[in-house]
Amino acid sequence: MGGRGQWSRSSRKRIRYKSVGTLSQSAIDATGINHSAGETIYIGSDRKGHISKHKDEFTDFNGTYNRIGEIIGSPDYIGKHPNGQSIEFVKRLEENTLVAVRINQSKLTVRTMHTLSEVTFNKRLAKGRYRRYN
């Protein structure tokens, strides 16, 4: 797929993918997923439309959307969705922001981004779903 920040096409669905970061060893250790450090994390061209459904939750939607790579690379908290199919990167920006990355055998892809209320965040933290990221 193209280099960081470049879009490349998927012939199957006509979705273009862009690199937004890489999977760190710390993320692997924290979530126990079976992937290798340094694997590229992509976002599909179809995701912004999906994610924009949550735009009213954000003080600055476009600014936060443009920080997805930073959220993945330097989250404050990390966890795994209970269904085991995605990693959740949480960063405390203007809002508690969650970026979910789908765990797939062939590719790691951003699935969604949305805010977390303080109540929801604290419940998930208390249940052990999230842990502080190094």
Question: Predicted segment positions?
Answer:
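Ribonuclease/tRNase effector modules and their secretory precursors
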Residues: 1-134
